[in-house]
Amino acid sequence: MSFKSLIQDMRGELGSISRKGFDVRFGYGRSRSQRVVQDTSVPVDAFKQSCWASMPPELLRDVLMRIEQSEDTWPSRKNVVSCAGVCRNWREIVKEIVRVPELSSKLTFPISLKQPGPRGSLVQCYIMRNRSNQTYYLYLGLNQAASNDDGKFLLAAKRFRRPTCTDYIISLNCDDVSRGSNTYIGKLRSNFLGTKFTVYDAQPTNPGTQVTRTRSSRLLSLKQVSPRIPSGNYPVAHISYELNVLGSRGPRRMQCVMDAIPASAVEPGGTAPTQTELVHSNLDSFPSFSFFRSKSIRAESLPSGPSSAAQKEGLLVLKNKAPRWHEQLQCWCLNFNGRVTVASVKNFQLVAAPENGPAGPEHENVILQFGKVGKDVFTMDYQYPISAFQAFTICLSSFDTKIACE
């Protein structure tokens, strides 16, 4: 039997095992994609009957590598996820084979949404807004969002208005978008005016993160992060909007301080922190904590201008790319390379602000762009050093009404 036939036979058996023993539930398409990845395994009896149970490790690794290389786009990439769900040995091999998005430009497992995007190329996504239930859905889609092409569901966010702020709860499962869900991965919180936002991650990015309880002054130092710690609120970014001097037709002025990413990450040879494991904890079994980095900059104290305290601490700061005036259209324009088709004050492109001195070529690269393509449909393209989760939260901040800025 040829190697190609071997792989095809393996895929067929994986599909049979998947239908009988477990549900991958990493759906593709809007009608079926409102699901969350479940790290389930095949019943032992079902797998023992398979001829793949006794396959030599070297041959198994070779077969899995062939599958990973050939199934590089969704929905066929679900076969890679299926392989990881067979048993612990298969999972470990697949985890070694599947590279992070920074190197592979692929989103495979849920943890990929918390890892920096690829270098030098944008991951093309789009956001669908449901006005009736104040929910936002993030999809991975290489084609125009306005086409009939269904995208791969990634994240969901639900808006909750409070007396003094607004929260956007973010989940891996759009059917259960709440703080108490075990698929909760973070949130975005705005101030009363909707001009300043804080992005919270449910788990720390930096192993040296310090934890503080909101109703107590006790400080708990964590020398290393345990995968068993409860989900909390770790600030990883702060977003501020300023007065729009270009008027209502120009893009909003915004600045993003990335607490978890050093400014050197965008320089040649620079690196950004990368999470390796998602924590799925039921918040009902833990006390309510609120977590803060010891050196994080609070949203209320964010200064304006590029020479802020954030840059003095060596944090990455993202700022608006300056638009140009279009004489024919009589409006301010940005080059979205065809990814944005409808003029909107929400449209923006973000680049890295230089730490000191003049801007280098790395500060001209668009790290995140967001824009409107139809009613309640928006494109979101991002790249290294930010993750899909961070990009999604920044884009969510653009949906809020900002009377004080316009």
From Swiss-Prot:
Keywords: Cell membrane, Cytoplasm, Membrane, Nucleus, Plastid, Stress response
Highest taxon listed in the record's lineage: Eukaryota
Tissue spec: Ubiquitous at low levels. Not detected in mature siliques.
Effect of R189A: Loss of plasma membrane tethering
Effect of inactivating the gene: Reduced colonization of the roots by the mutualistic fungus Piriformospora indica.
Principal location listed in the UniProt entry: membrane
GO cellular component, one term: plasma membrane
Effect of K187A: Loss of plasma membrane tethering
Task of the protein: Involved in abiotic stress signaling. Tethered to plasma membrane (PM) and probably bound to phosphatidylinositol 4,5-bisphosphate. Abiotic stresses (drought, salt, H(2)O(2)) trigger phospholipase C mediated PM dislogement and plastidial and nucleocytosolic relocation of TULP3.
Family membership noted in the UniProt record: Belongs to the TUB family.
Protein name: Tubby-like F-box protein 3
Species, as recorded: Arabidopsis thaliana
Organism taxonomic ancestry: Eukaryota, Viridiplantae, Streptophyta, Embryophyta, Tracheophyta
Originating gene: TULP3
